[in-house]
Curated annotation (Swiss-Prot):
Gene Ontology terms describing biological process: prolyl-tRNA aminoacylation
Reactions catalysed according to its record: tRNA(Pro) + L-proline + ATP = L-prolyl-tRNA(Pro) + AMP + diphosphate
Pfam families in the record: HGTP_anticodon, tRNA-synt_2b
GO CC terms in record: cytosol
Example GO molecular function: ATP binding
Compartments reported by the entry: Cytoplasm
Biological role: Catalyzes the attachment of proline to tRNA(Pro) in a two-step reaction: proline is first activated by ATP to form Pro-AMP and then transferred to the acceptor end of tRNA(Pro).
Name listed for the protein in its UniProt record: Proline--tRNA ligase
Record note on quaternary structure: Homodimer.
UniProt-listed Enzyme Commission number(s): 6.1.1.15
Species, as recorded: Zymomonas mobilis subsp. mobilis (strain ATCC 31821 / ZM4 / CP4)
Main location: cytoplasm
InterPro entries in the cross-refs: aa-tRNA-synt_IIb (IPR002314), aa-tRNA-synth_II (IPR006195), aa-tRNA-synth_II/BPL/LPL (IPR045864), Anticodon-bd (IPR004154), Anticodon-bd_dom_sf (IPR036621), Pro-tRNA-ligase_IIa (IPR002316), Pro-tRNA-synth_IIa_bac-type (IPR004500), Pro-tRNA_synthetase (IPR050062)
HAMAP family linked: Pro_tRNA_synth_type2
């Protein structure tokens, strides 16, 4: 994409109402613009990152055996009355009446909707186990929306729901999602620590939240220093309950807790390896058994023909929130540092002198070759000062920068910069192309 044809309204100054670094950088980098309190329009650069995050999450959900569907944003109030949550949920739920005076709501979550949908379309215990998920915009009328996409009123969520005939099978599906979440966050370049959590209004007796460490996090967290080790992708057989349980056990054996769930005994055992930081919740999973299936009459005939209430679980990832968490965990004084897996573009190509024939020829040729090789490239071909171009590329945080100037063009060389560590090297155009495409093939 040529930057001269792109829509990238970067800001030189930090908006006064932006309090945390992710909000500041997303505004300055032209990723979002606020349209109302806690509601944002996603501009092209921000939307590309959202789509990349969605892709990774979809792949890991599919690997764990989940099927994608899409439920409506509007739900009937009667569904929520079936579960008993309509009056209990509170004013953060947006309630609506249509022209026929029928009560609707803009769903803040989908337990009731998915329970009714699957209840009406499964016939036998042989149809289980099942996991369904969808990715959908949601709305919660927060009293005080703040921190940009981290605490907005409208947000993008991945919700998954599991259905099983007994508790043993239900906990197996819970572990499937536990491991799928670990792999999703690892691929996104995040170290997400699973911590035992309260079930809150969702309900149930088993729950973990996944916390990313960040200086500007929303809550205090306490953890063993082993959690500071690099993440790795977990090769798992999702159909093997014992193997999955072993993986889960490995990931809850080292101490980690939010302020509400602290355990003084385990903290004492951790000793000088205990760490304290701030954290951001990026995912939350629940096993709530028959909390929704019983009041909503969701049973299936078991092997003996008798009706059995279905065991359920719920699994959420805040996708738009994740984007903010990635920035909180990966930035410097100059701007964002995107992990390669989610970067909106892989390469930022800078032509320092668009009026120089040599520069233009080399830059145009390299841009065309990179695009043909499948390397997403943002080509700064604007008639701007070099300093402004460097500042823009650092701000938006693309993993690699290729700089072409008049002196280098005469020699057939370019400057290649790694945004993450700042290392620069002057190499031939061909070597730069080979390095960038080789890295792409390895991914």
């Amino acid at each position: 994409m040529r930057l001269s044809r792109y829509f990238l309204p970067v800001m030189k100054e930090t908006p006064a109402d932006a309090q945390i670094i992710s909000h500041k950088l997303m505004l300055r980098a032209g990723m979002i613009r606020q349209t109302a309190a806690g509601i944002y329009a996603w501009l092209p650069l921000g939307l590309r990152v959202l789509r990349r995050i969605e892709k990774i999450i979809r792949e890991e959900q599919a690997r764990a055996g989940a099927l994608e569907l899409l439920m409506p944003t509007l739900q009937t109030a009667d569904l929520w009355r079936e579960s008993g949550r309509y009056d209990a949920y509170g004013p953060e739920m947006l309630r609506i009446k249509d022209r026929h005076n029928r009560e609707l709501l803009y769903g803040p979550t989908n337990e009731e909707m998915i329970t009714a949908l699957i209840r009406d379309n499964l016939q036998s215990y042989r149809d289980l186990p099942r996991i369904f998920y969808h990715i959908q915009w949601k709305f919660r009328d927060e009293v005080r929306p703040r921190f940009g996409v981290m605490r907005g009123r409208e947000f993008l969520m991945k919700d998954a729901y599991s259905f099983d005939i007994d508790e043993t099978a239900g906990r197996h599906n819970y572990n499937r999602m536990f491991v799928a979440y670990l792999n999703s966050f690892s691929r996104l370049g995040l170290r997400a620590i699973p911590m035992q959590a309260d079930t809150g209004p969702i309900g149930g007796d088993l729950s973990h939240e996944f916390i990313v460490l960040a200086p500007n996090g929303e809550s205090d967290v306490f953890y063993h220093s082993n959690w500071e080790q690099p993440t790795r992708h977990i090769e798992a057989d999702f159909d093997d309950p014992k193997a999955l349980q072993s993986i889960v056990n490995d990931h809850i054996s080292d101490y980690a807790a939010t302020d509400e769930k602290r355990d003084p005994l385990r903290e004492a055992q951790a000793g000088d390896k205990l760490r304290q930081s701030r954290g951001i919740e990026v995912g939350h999973i629940f096993f709530f058994g028959t909390k929704y299936s019983k009041p909503m009459g969701f049973t299936l005939p078991g092997p003996d023909g008798k009706p059995i209430p279905i065991q359920m679980g719920s699994y959420g990832i805040g996708i738009s929130r994740l984007l903010g968490a990635i920035i909180e965990a990966s930035h410097d004084d100059n701007g964002i540092i995107w992990p390669e897996a989610v970067a909106p573009y892989h390469v930022g190509l800078i032509n320092l002198r668009i009026d120089d024939e040599n520069c233009r020829a080399i830059a145009d040729s390299l841009y065309q070759r990179l695009e043909a090789a499948g390397i997403d490239t943002l080509y700064d071909d604007r008639n701007e000062r070099g300093g402004a171009k460097f500042a823009t590329m650092d701000l938006i945080g693309l993993p690699w920068q290729v700089v072409i100037g008049p002196k280098g063009a005469e020699k057939g060389v370019v400057e290649l910069k790694n945004r993450a560590n700042g290392e620069k090297q002057t190499i031939s155009v061909e070597n730069a192309f080979n390095l960038l495409t080789a890295g792409h093939q390895q991914r």
